[in-house]
Amino acid sequence: MSAKTDEILESLKSLSLLEASELVKQIEEAFGVSAAASAGVVMAAPGAAGGGEAAEEKTEFDVILESFEASAKIKVLKAVREATGLGLGDAKALVEAAPKLVKEGASKDDAEALKKAIEEVGGKVTIK
């Protein structure tokens, strides 16, 4: 690799999970691409080769914090921290930046449990 790509790689390694998520969003916007779309194409290809078989049920879901009641900010922040394992600063930045991806690639049960936990304390969540 060139020195420039080595430098970029080292910078990427030092990013927090929240920073990496924000970087992905910025790349998607800047280049007009979607990281999720490529995964969907890969998953759809085996079903298409099956010749008329029913589409497989989606197994991974993204949990998105859409908004929250101002009076419930601290409770929502705690629920997000518990679910993601983020530090206080990263969780606060995530909650304040709503709408924001909270958890990516969660199982259906985990996504539903996280949605319930956040909505019980005053947040509005969607699952995609």
Swiss-Prot record:
**CDD domains with a match to the protein in the record:** Ribosomal_L7_L12 (cd00387)
| InterPro entries given in the database record | Ribosomal_bL12, Ribosomal_bL12_C, Ribosomal_bL12_C/ClpS-like, Ribosomal_bL12_oligo, Ribosomal_bL12_oligo_N_sf
Q: Name one Pfam family in it.
A: Ribosomal_L12_N
SUPFAM superfamilies (alphabetical): ClpS-like, Ribosomal protein L7/12, oligomerisation (N-terminal) domain
A molecular-function term among this protein's GO annotations: structural constituent of ribosome
Q: Which residues cross the membrane?
A: none
| Family as reported in the entry's similarity comment | Belongs to the bacterial ribosomal protein bL12 family.
Name-wise, this protein is Large ribosomal subunit protein bL12
Tell me the name of the encoding gene: rplL
